[in-house]
């Protein structure tokens, strides 16, 4: 990709558990993403997330101009005062300039901070940066919040991996509502670690959701872990197929509920969103 795009600025947002089937480990993912740093060499610029432990380890190999961004650790482009509004969208200060986002989720606050940082590296005016980020909206099926008849649906079903699942669950916890419902499916391309990674997500669901509905072979591990973490059989349910799960949620939704819908793209969870919003 570097040879095709020929970037002059490279950005490392995070290094996580996506595509482990192909890279085998987080270290393998780090090695692949680190190829961007190798390409940049000594004459080009790397912008990296100072709050991501694996990224920080990986950037030790960079030889060129290294710039950092983040909300927690000291960095050249440090976001301050991060708060989320009623839609879960981040508002923060960067070098005392207010940034307001229309994309929900704490993880997207990092994306917004990185984008603003790149703008400043390229000498874009603050007003232009603020306007552009305030106007940018999520694309379909990526942290897309839809409201209908008192129901809030977080449509995040374009794809899923363990890190994005955890980020979506955090968003579910941040959006106000009467009941928090996680409607989740399999995360694919995780290789031999798939069972353990689904279980880790299930344990987190128990801390963020009132109800877990799941379907898919691997999601049985997710439901089992949620039950082990404290959810009972009425709170954490597994369904044999998507249609049965869709029928259940359609019959049991209430005004004020917040429903997160997320799975790997091949699970076709967009069908669930369509059913919920009918």
Regions found by a protein language model. Name each.
Residues 17, 52, 158-160, 189, ...:
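Short, glycine/acidic-enriched loop or turn micro-motifs at the edges of active sites
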Residues 139, 157, 161-231:
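Active-site beta-alpha connecting loops in nucleotide-dependent enzymes
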Residues 2, 6-152, 177-178, 203, ...:
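Acidic, Mg2+-coordinating active-site environments of NTP-dependent enzymes
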Residues 140-142, 266-274:
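ATP-dependent carboxylate/acyl-activation modules
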Residues 245-252:
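Short amphipathic alpha-helix with an adjacent loop that forms part of the alpha/beta core around
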Residues 20-27, 165, 191-194, 269-271:
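Glycine/threonine-rich flexible loop motifs
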Residues 235-245:
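Short acidic-hydrophobic, aromatic-tinged amphipathic segments that line or gate anion-handling sites
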Residues 11-17, 49, 155, 181-186, ...:
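Short beta-strands and strand-loop turn motifs
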């Amino acid at each position: 990709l570097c040879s095709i795009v020929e970037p002059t600025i490279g950005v490392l947002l995070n290094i996580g558990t996506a595509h482990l089937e192909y890279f085998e480990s987080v270290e393998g993912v780090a090695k692949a993403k680190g190829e961007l740093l190798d390409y940049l060499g000594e004459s080009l610029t790397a912008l990296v997330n100072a709050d991501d432990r694996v990224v920080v380890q990986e950037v030790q190999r960079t030889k060129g101009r290294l710039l950092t961004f983040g909300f927690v650790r000291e960095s050249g482009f440090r976001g301050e005062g991060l708060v989320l509004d009623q839609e879960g969208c981040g508002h923060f200060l960067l070098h005392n300039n207010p940034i307001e986002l229309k994309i929900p989720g704490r993880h997207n606050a990092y994306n917004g901070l990185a984008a603003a940082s790149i703008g400043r590296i390229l000498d874009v005016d603050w007003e232009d940066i603020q306007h552009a980020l305030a106007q940018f909206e999520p694309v379909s099926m990526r942290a897309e919040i839809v409201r209908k008849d008192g129901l809030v649906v977080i449509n995040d079903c374009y794809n899923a991996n363990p890190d994005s699942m955890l980020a979506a669950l955090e968003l579910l916890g941040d959006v106000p509502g009467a009941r928090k419902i996680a409607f989740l499916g399999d995360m694919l391309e995780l290789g031999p670690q798939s069972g353990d990674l689904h279980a880790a997500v299930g344990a987190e669901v128990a801390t963020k959701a009132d109800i877990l509905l799941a379907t898919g072979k691997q999601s049985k591990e997710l439901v089992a872990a949620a039950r082990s973490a404290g959810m009972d059989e009425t709170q954490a349910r597994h369904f044999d197929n998507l249609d049965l799960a869709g029928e259940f949620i359609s019959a049991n939704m209430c005004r004020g509920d917040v429903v997160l819908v997320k799975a790997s793209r091949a699970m076709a969870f967009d069908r669930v969103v369509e059913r919920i919003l009918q």
